Amino acid sequence: MEETMAEEGCCENVESTFDDGTNCISKTEDTGGIESKRFYLARTTAFEMLRDRGYEVNEAELSLTLSEFRSVFGEKPELERLRICVPLRSDPKKKILVVFMGTEPITVKSVRALHIQISNNVGLHAMILVLQSKMNHFAQKALTTFPFTVETFPIEDLLVNITKHIQQPKIEILNKEEKEQLLRKHALEDKQLPYLQEKDSFVRYYGLKKKQVVKITYSKEPVGDFVTYRCII
């Protein structure tokens, strides 16, 4: 295994082929309604993303088929029924809420209404908004009034799980002790590591914060694995 601090692209544009041999086109072929298919794909990816972030996700949610989804939610799902609220495995008192927003433009008024609506939800420490419309600058600023981090994802970004791509490298998030051990081993400061920006799609998927470090392993036949580390900036 080759280990390096050198710069290596983590998120290059690659042809959309997945582990099961399908591509984006074959993944989305369907004779049913488009609206229910979009919600099904986005909600499934949201569950997978939460699981990968360390939240407790029921296996039944991950294995739900499109036909089963439609039998539960219908062809035109009610947005409130699509909401997800799951606890953190390491601290079940902490919960994250995923809210699917409507197609109307998101304004300060709608953000404030949501704030009031979820104010009695005990234990929330994070929230994700799945957007079907644009959010203006003032509405984005209003999100900072929440007592926890609020992330936003356009629904289009969740139609495919980017971590399932056949050419996607293995990503491991280092904890504080592992990060310190790495820096000592190579006599480095975190700012000297190659970096990934917070807006990077993989950083957003895992919900990583500034100064966190990830280990990235590329499988390169026939020479074996290639390892690099990145710091979030």
UniProtKB/Swiss-Prot annotation:
GO terms for molecular function: DNA binding; DNA-directed RNA polymerase activity. It is found in: Nucleus. Expressed in flower buds and siliques. GO terms for cellular component: RNA polymerase V complex. The keyword Acyltransferase does not apply. The keyword Disulfide bond does not apply. One of its GO terms (biological process) is DNA-templated transcription. It comes from the Eukaryota. Disulfide bonds: none annotated. Pfam families: RNA_pol_Rpb5_C, RNA_pol_Rpb5_N. InterPro entries: Arch_Rpo5/euc_Rpb5 (IPR014381), RNA_pol_Rpb5_N (IPR005571), RNA_pol_Rpb5_N_sf (IPR036710), RNA_pol_subH/Rpb5_C (IPR000783), RPB5-like_sf (IPR035913). PANTHER family: DNA-DIRECTED RNA POLYMERASE V SUBUNIT 5C, DNA-DIRECTED RNA POLYMERASES I, II, AND III SUBUNIT RPABC1. Component of the RNA polymerase V complex. Belongs to the archaeal Rpo5/eukaryotic RPB5 RNA polymerase subunit family. DNA-dependent RNA polymerase catalyzes the transcription of DNA into RNA using the four ribonucleoside triphosphates as substrates. Component of RNA polymerase V involved in RNA-directed DNA methylation-dependent (RdDM) silencing of endogenous repeated sequences, including transposable elements. This is DNA-directed RNA polymerase V subunit 5C. It comes from Arabidopsis thaliana. The lineage of its organism: Eukaryota, Viridiplantae, Streptophyta, Embryophyta, Tracheophyta.
